[in-house]
From Swiss-Prot:
Source organism superkingdom: Archaea
Protein name per the record: Methionine synthase
Family per record: Belongs to the archaeal MetE family.
GO BP: methionine biosynthetic process; methylation
Known EC number: 2.1.1.-
Pfam families, sorted: Meth_synt_2
Known function: Catalyzes the transfer of a methyl group to L-homocysteine resulting in methionine formation. The physiological methyl donor is unknown.
Top-level taxonomy: Archaea, Methanobacteriati, Methanobacteriota, Thermococci, Thermococcales
Length: 338
């Protein structure tokens, strides 16, 4: 399968419509039937898909409309977790932090229904399914059962592996593991790497790994050891500085973050064009995907949309220049290709 050179994608989350946030609150209070909530989620999913498509994104997602939060969604569906209540993250942001109180088991699909709905309702051939990785789920949960972190993380890796196999069996072609916490503790990075490799064991489709706001020089030491097709990393927030760690990236793709998801300022098309060309100092264009730094959910929806629009406009400008050199397409690589 071939894609246009410099395929554009998203990382995962997107601002939820205000009416969907109200539905989440009503559901939490037990004031609406579950079928009404599900209908609202599906409507929001289609609305966000259309925004991504209208912006021109090649490989969209629905902005995680089905998910209340990136770890809570998964821990709520994995047997062995228990919720005690909300935990403050920063400012006025809270999430329900789960505790492992028994052996963790895969009791039901985690995102299968979500994927099938998105695939049915998109006009694009490929969608990217983001899934929170095993190390981050463990890092952002309490452990009240396992004797050590390793056994906790590796049981989660086995559960994620079952979900990836379920998705692959149902036609998913591109999955992204989100591991924003994997570099929190340098001495535990080998454990995170082992967990990622266990999670993708037996998987043949395309798998990306998203890591953000971390020491990428530490990650670069493991580029060759991590069995993924692509590393989706943030660069706009760090103003595209200190990128020499990319010299260690070979034989795998880079998802190049070109818009800052923590800054409401909308990057200009020219700024994004210059950023993309800077990446060419490290990788050939055929090994680059273009995406935001991270999930866009913390931004105003109109700002998030315009950032995507400008990202796509910039890519189209660079594509035209590359096409003059006879470089118009890129291969859709999978784990079988690395």
């Amino acid at each position: 399968m071939e894609l246009p050179i410099l395929p554009t994608s998203v990382i995962g989350s997107y601002p939820k419509p205000r009416w969907l946030l109200r539905m989440y609150k009503l559901r939490e209070l037990g004031k609406i039937p579950e079928e009404d909530f599900k209908e609202a989620v599906k409507d929001a999913s289609v609305a966000v898909l259309r925004e991504h498509e209208r912006a021109g994104v090649d490989i969209p997602w629905d902005g995680e409309m089905w998910r209340s939060e990136m770890t809570e969604h998964f821990t709520a569906k994995i047997s062995g977790f228990k919720f005690y209540g909300p935990v403050r993250v920063w400012g006025n942001a809270y999430f329900n932090k789960a505790a492992a109180v028994d052996k963790l088991e895969y009791k039901e699909p985690l995102v299968l229904e979500e994927f099938l709905w998105v695939r049915e309702n998109t006009t694009r051939e490929i969608v990217k399914v983001p899934i929170t990785g095993p190390y981050t789920i463990a890092e952002w949960s309490f452990n009240e059962y396992y004797p050590d972190k390793e056994s906790f993380v590796m049981d989660l890796a086995k559960i994620i592996n079952k979900e990836l196999k379920t998705l692959e069996e149902h036609g998913a072609t591109y999955i992204q593991l989100d591991e924003p916490a994997m570099l929190n503790h340098p001495d535990e990075v080998p454990l995170a790497v082992e967990a990622i490799n266990r999670a993708v064991k037996g998987i043949k489709i395309k798998v990306g790994l998203h890591v953000c706001y971390s020491n990428y020089y530490l990650l670069a030491d493991y580029f060759d050891d991590i069995r993924v097709t692509q590393f989706a990393l943030e660069f706009a927030n760090r103003q595209f500085r200190d990128m020499d760690f990319l010299k260690k990236l070979s034989g795998k793709e880079l998802g190049f973050g070109v818009v800052d998801v923590h800054n409401p300022r909308i990057e200009t098309v020219d700024e994004i064009v210059r950023a993309i060309k800077k990446a060419f100092n490290y990788l050939e264009p055929e090994w680059l995907y273009i995406n935001p730094d991270c999930g866009l959910k913390l931004l105003d929806r109109r700002i998030a949309y315009q950032k995507l629009v400008n990202m796509v406009k910039a890519v189209r400008i660079v594509r035209k220049e590359l096409e003059k050199e006879g470089r118009a397409e890129t291969e859709f690589r999978t784990l079988n290709d690395i």
